[in-house]
């Protein structure tokens, strides 16, 4: 544990940010999993709507600094390619 007051405050801030990032990444994984499940089931209309949701969540996570913006774009591109190949 830190002894300096400012370092103790930073530990609290880091814990909050870590919890937020963990929550956002979990939501991303869930959204991607649901998209892939609907794609595997052959429900393409639902997959299209879920892809829009995944894209939105990925770009929001990139805007908040949870993931890099290039990673978000790459994931969106790969998921869209996966959808287009399935259709």
Curated annotation (Swiss-Prot):
Gene Ontology cellular component annotations, sorted alphabetically: cytosol; small ribosomal subunit
Single GO molecular function: small ribosomal subunit rRNA binding
Protein name from the UniProt record: Small ribosomal subunit protein bS20
Family: Belongs to the bacterial ribosomal protein bS20 family.
GO BP term, example: translation
Cited InterPro entries: Ribosomal_bS20 (IPR002583), Ribosomal_bS20_sf (IPR036510)
Record function comment: Binds directly to 16S ribosomal RNA.
Alphabetic keyword roster: Ribonucleoprotein, Ribosomal protein, RNA-binding, rRNA-binding
């Amino acid at each position: 544990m830190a002894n300096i007051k400012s370092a103790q405050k930073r530990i609290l801030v880091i814990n909050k940010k870590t919890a937020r990032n963990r929550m956002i990444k979990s939501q991303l994984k869930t959204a991607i999993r649901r998209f892939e499940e609907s794609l595997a089931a052959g429900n393409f209309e639902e997959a299209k709507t879920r892809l829009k949701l995944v894209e939105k969540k990925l770009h929001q996570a990139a805007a908040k600094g949870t993931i890099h913006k290039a990673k978000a774009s790459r994931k969106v591109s790969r998921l869209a390619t996966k959808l287009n190949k399935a259709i």
